[in-house]
Amino acid sequence: MKDKFYELSIKTSNFYDEILELVFSFGVTCVEELDHEIIIREEYDLKDIAWGVEEYAKGLSSVRKISNDLKISLNLKENKDWLGEYKRAVKPILVDKIYIRPSWEESLSGVTNIIIDPALAFGSGHHESTNSCLQLLQKYAKSGDTALDVGCGSGILSIALAKLGCKVDACDTDEQATQSSLSNAQLNEVKFNKIWTGSIANLEQKYDIVVANIIADVIFMLSNDLKKSLKKGGYLVLSGILNKYEDRIKDTFKDLELVEIKQANDWVSFVYKEMDE
């Protein structure tokens, strides 16, 4: 562990969800969400991310003709034990019959326990999109299904699918994410059928259920590959999407059957089905 770390504080009311979505796309490993504030902590300099956020906010302000209320600060701090402080702030969460907890918390009986520690990769179950995905997977995934997690991040959804009895493949374009997924799988005593760093382009296998909890722009880019990865009658769960993209999602996936939409604050998730012929 290095002696110092960088802490980037991003405060905004007008562009909170958009900037949070942008931050997710940067692939940083430790994000804390507060009321109208996003805090990023890393051991490498975050000045490029700070610049990107500032430019993005300027663009949003110009296009939408609303005030730019962004306040941003970047500080170099002594690395006393910020991860320890973060641990104290992370609480377990129950999502239907799945209990997500950090390793230092006790297990909960009568439900499926998933252990996810902070600072590995995104996905602790607290964010609306991940929470919605967990609810939807419990509803549509069946034991024995083949499943694909696109953009697996921390591996929380892959692990949930495995614990639901699915045969799971997972991928992410970020090698740190795939390594985090493998570490978390080992922590939870589950195994994936296959995991790789890369995309789903030219993927030959088809699945009973495919989940993509990633930002909307990437979903649009991968839309054809996502559709091709479905078996007849298979389910596609899309999440990580701000509600402003709802109409565009519906248009992009109109050749599939829309089964369910789940709204959580400004975030929306979709369940589609590949229609049987």
UniProtKB/Swiss-Prot annotation:
Its EC number is 2.1.1.-. It is an enzyme of class 2 (transferase). GO terms for molecular function: protein-lysine N-methyltransferase activity. S-adenosyl-L-methionine binds at residues 130, 151, 172, 213. Keywords: Cytoplasm, Methyltransferase, S-adenosyl-L-methionine, Transferase. Gene3D superfamilies: Vaccinia Virus protein VP39. Pfam families: PrmA. Signal peptide: none annotated. One of its GO terms (biological process) is methylation. GO terms for cellular component: cytoplasm. It catalyses: L-lysyl-[protein] + 3 S-adenosyl-L-methionine = N(6),N(6),N(6)-trimethyl-L-lysyl-[protein] + 3 S-adenosyl-L-homocysteine + 3 H(+). It is found in: Cytoplasm. Belongs to the methyltransferase superfamily. PrmA family. HAMAP family: Methyltr_PrmA (MF_00735). Methylates ribosomal protein L11. This is Ribosomal protein L11 methyltransferase. It comes from Campylobacter concisus (strain 13826). The lineage of its organism: Bacteria, Pseudomonadati, Campylobacterota, Epsilonproteobacteria, Campylobacterales.
